[in-house]
C-alpha cells in the first residue's frame, strides 16, 4: 500500500514540489493537494502581464485540473477546501467544508499574505493588495471605473503593479519611504536610473513619504494624507509593502514557529511527519519572498520524500530582476560593500547603462547591472561558487567570454 502524502497549498512552492515528485518518485505516494483558489496551479510570477493585459489566465495556467487527474493526484481547490485544522495525533487534516483526509506525511506550503499598513482608512473600499488572480481581477475592474491610483511601496511588486495600472490607462503615483525605488535591491545610482526611466513612462512618485491616513468618501478611498501635510488623490490604493508568512495553521497544531514555521535543512518541522517549504517557513533565521529559493527548497524536499538521499537546503544569494517590459536590471549579493571592498564601475548615461561589481578578498561579493544585464548569470555563478578572481580581475567587468578566453590562455601557457 502506498503512503499518503498531503500537501497544503497549491502555489509556487507546493506545485514545484509536485513537479519534482513526479520525476523522482511518481508511484511512491497517494497524493492529495488542498488549495484555497478555485484553479489548478498558475504562474504567480506572470500576474504583472496579466494585469497589463499582455496575458490571459489560460496563458499563465501551468497545471490545470486535467494535469492532476493525469498524474493520479487528488486536488481539492477553492475557499471551502482551505485546511482549518491539523490533527497531529490522528494524522489527518480537516478542510473548511468538513473534508477530512489522513496523511502519513504532510507538507505545509501555505505561503504568505500581503502586509497591510495599519493606518486609518486601510479598510476602505478600493484599498487592496496585488497577490493573486482575484486581486488582479479587482484591480482591472477598478481601473475600468476610476482614473487615479496610488501604489504604496516601490519594491518589485509595487512597481509591477504601478506599470500594469498605467498600462490600463490610470494615472499612477508610487508612494515610497525611501528616495529611490527598489532601495533594497539597487544602489543609489541604479535606483536613480530606474526612477528616471519610470518617470519618462508616465509614473509619478512621492518619495521619502510618511503615509498617515487613507481618506475616504462614502466608504470609498479618495486619497492619501502624509505627515508633511500633503495629499495625493487616489480612488484605488494598492498596498505592496511586504508579506507575512501564513503560520497560523502550523501554530494551531503546536508546531514551532517564530516569524515563519521553523524547519531543518531537510525542510522538516519539529514533527518528523510534517514538512514545510516556501514563503511560510523560517530556515536558519531567514524567511523568503522570491521564487528561486522556493524552487531550491522543493528540490531538496522531493529528494528527501523520495528517499534518494539526504539533500540539504542552503540559502544562496538571490538575484533581482524587474518584470517591466523594456527595463533591464539585475542585482545580487552585497552590492553596497564596505571599506574592505573594491569597486569596479562602468557608467554610460547616454546609453542608460550602469554596472557595478563589488569585490572582496579577490572574490565577487555583489553586483548591480542596469540597462545591460546579459552577464547577470555569469556574476551569479561567480558569487555562488566563490570563484577566485585573481587571474581574471582585469576582465571580469567585461563578462564571461573574455574571462574564459583569459583562463584558456593561462592554461595553454602552463601546459
Language-model features and meaning:
Residues 1-4, 10, 23, 280-377, ...:
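Mid-to-C-terminal Rossmann-like scaffold of FAD/NAD(P)H-dependent oxidoreductases
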Residues 12-15, 38, 112-114, 134, ...:
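Residue-level detector of alpha-helix initiation sites
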Residues 139, 389-415:
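Cysteine/selenocysteine-centered motifs that mediate thiol-based redox chemistry or coordinate metal-sulfur cofactors
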Residues 1-77, 164-185:
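Beta1-alpha1 glycine-rich phosphate/pyrophosphate-binding loop at the start
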Residues 123-145, 216-225, 230-303:
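FAD-site-proximal beta/loop scaffold in flavoenzymes
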Residues 30, 75-95, 101, 168-262:
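A Rossmann-like FAD-binding core segment of flavoenzymes
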Residues 138-186, 221:
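Rossmann-like NAD(P)H-binding beta-loop-alpha module
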Residues 1-6, 62-150, 225-229, 238-240, ...:
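FAD-binding core/adjacent interface of flavoenzyme oxidoreductases
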